């Protein structure tokens, strides 16, 4: 995914780079979108979440169906919020948001959300703000999110990491490592990387943090 214009390209590593064909433009996400910051896959589909253009609120969930070769997109899955985290499991897509949209416009929402999307019906099942014990501020930006080896959905809220049971939506563990300052990018997700050594590496608060 590229900025500007939220364009999605595919690259064949077995072929030489050709600026006209490899990478190949696959889709241009429309409806005033600019930054495709999160991608995941599942059920033979690619899911892309975006941040809108300057002066605009409301991101897009774009979906490519490999079986049909067709794209679809859905604006404002969470009203007036950008999608900055995606994770797939068992026919459901989990997304997380930032209250901020494009530059030059203040957010309308007060709390970031997690949403659950039914992949088979292309319908949102629910949205909610997780109750995170001990967090120092109301979440305004949640992401990245990722399923861990324990089956929980893990996520980051600025300086806090948490793990949520995807069935009950209960946050079963959390830890505030740094204060929530929100003094860097308001949409770029904090990374979560599950390593072969059993460690979880993150960039919460824009710092490299290793968690055992």
What is each of the regions a protein language model found here?
Residues 12-16, 65-69, 118-122, 165-169, ...:
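Short loop/turn segments that connect beta-strands within beta-propeller blades
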Residues 3-4, 13, 51-53, 98-101, ...:
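Short loop/turn segments immediately following the C-termini of beta-strands
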Residues 194-212:
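Blade-level signature of beta-propeller repeat domains, shared across WD40, Kelch, NHL, RCC1
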Residues 15-32, 71-81, 122-139, 175-185:
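Surface-exposed loop and turn segments in beta-propeller and other repeat-based domains
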Residues 7-9, 59-62, 112-115, 160-162, ...:
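A short loop-to-beta-strand structural motif that recurs across blades of beta-propeller domains
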Residues 48-58, 96-112:
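Short, conserved, GDST-rich strand-edge loop motifs in beta-rich repeat architectures
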Residues 1, 45-49, 93-96, 152-155, ...:
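Conserved beta-propeller blade signature
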Residues 31-41, 79-89, 135-146, 181-197:
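Repeated scaffold domains used in trafficking and secretory/extracellular systems
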């Amino acid at each position: 995914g590229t900025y500007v214009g939220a364009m999605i390209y595919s690259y064949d590593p077995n072929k030489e780079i050709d600026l006209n064909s490899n990478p190949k433009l696959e889709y241009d996400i429309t409806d005033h979108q600019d930054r495709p910051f999160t991608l995941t896959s599942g059920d033979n589909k690619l899911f892309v979440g975006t941040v809108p253009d300057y002066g605009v609120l409301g991101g897009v969930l774009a979906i490519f169906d490999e079986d049909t070769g067709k794209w679809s997109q859905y604006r404002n899955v969470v009203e007036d919020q950008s999608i900055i985290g995606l994770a797939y499991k068992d026919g459901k897509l989990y997304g997380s948001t930032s209250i901020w949209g494009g530059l030059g416009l203040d957010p309308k929402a007060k709390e970031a959300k997690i949403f659950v999307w039914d992949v088979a019906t292309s319908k949102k099942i629910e949205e909610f703000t997780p109750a995170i014990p001990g967090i120092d501020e109301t979440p305004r930006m949640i992401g990245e999110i990722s399923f861990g080896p324990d089956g929980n959905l893990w996520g980051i809220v600025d300086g806090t990491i948490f793990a949520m049971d995807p069935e009950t939506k209960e946050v079963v563990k959390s830890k505030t490592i740094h204060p929530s300052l929100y003094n860097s990018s308001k949409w770029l997700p904090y990374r979560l990387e599950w390593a072969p050594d059993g460690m979880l590496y993150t960039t919460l608060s824009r710092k490299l943090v290793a968690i055992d």
